[in-house]
Amino acid sequence: MAKMVDALQPHCDEEIVAAMTCNHAGSMSSFLISKLMGSVGAGTKSSRLPNPVFIAVGSRSIYAFDYAPRGFKFKIKKEVARWPKDEVSVVAEKTNMMTTFVLTTGSGESYPLEVPTMMGGKELVDVFLNALDASQD
């Protein structure tokens, strides 16, 4: 997670305590299905956030960034959203392979996102969810 925090810190006006690259909920399974079945259902967009999106958590705000992966590094393109942390609720549900969570803002917008937890990612996701103050099922 340190590389993710380091990539985002220069773009935020407060200390970032956690960061994670996330996908729109369902997009990872949709990607696998599209590879098996062709482009059926490709191109659907369910959010104003880019997919994938980089989410950063500070003590006062939650940030969303558009980014491009560059090998094991990240090229941050631009900030696409910022919400006061105390106005965002997060509910998470974990499975063995995936954690799905929904960010709901004070204005009522909801952003269902997902992060893989396989291959040792569970501990990093737990740190991220704790920083978000997520309630977990």
Regions found by a protein language model. Give the residues of each.
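Anionic N-terminal interaction surfaces
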Residues: 1-55
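Phosphoinositide-binding peripheral membrane targeting modules
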Residues: 35-98, 105-109
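Short, surface-exposed beta-strand/loop "edge" segments at domain boundaries and coil↔beta transitions
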Residues: 26-29, 63-64, 109-113
